[in-house]
């Protein structure tokens, strides 16, 4: 589901990819309220389709997705858009997952429940946009 953003941030397509529908939708809605054009999906393949169709700037990807691993999705997103800023979330901490995520170039690794304001701060800084309150 794609949510519209404000004109000054509409070029910043932000994907939220999480098998937890409620958490994913809430995070996408948080970013929409803050002026981003956010899209939520629970499946990695849907995220890839959206990435091909739009100007992908950032993605928040959970480690565990319905149809592929979050690590595999991040690698493929970076093939589509090498400059994409990726944050990864996880329901429980496993050092090997964080190490692997950092090796494939993620910007930030957060444990759930992740603070939406903190996630927004990381995304805004990466994109060079001013946070709105």
Predicted regions and their residues:
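Alpha4 helix (beta4-alpha4-beta5 surface) of REC/receiver domains from two-component response regulators
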Residues: 72, 92-109
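Acidic catalytic/metal-coordinating carboxylates
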Residues: 43, 69-72
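The feature encodes the CheY-like receiver
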Residues: 66
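Short hydrophobic/Thr-rich beta-strand motif most characteristic of the beta2 strand and flanking loop
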Residues: 35-43, 50
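Non-catalytic signal-transmission and effector/linker regions of two-component phosphorelay proteins
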Residues: 1-19, 117-133
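Charged docking surfaces used in two-component/phosphorelay signaling
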Residues: 25-33
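Short amphipathic alpha-helix used as the core "switch/output" element in two-component signaling
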Residues: 49, 71-83
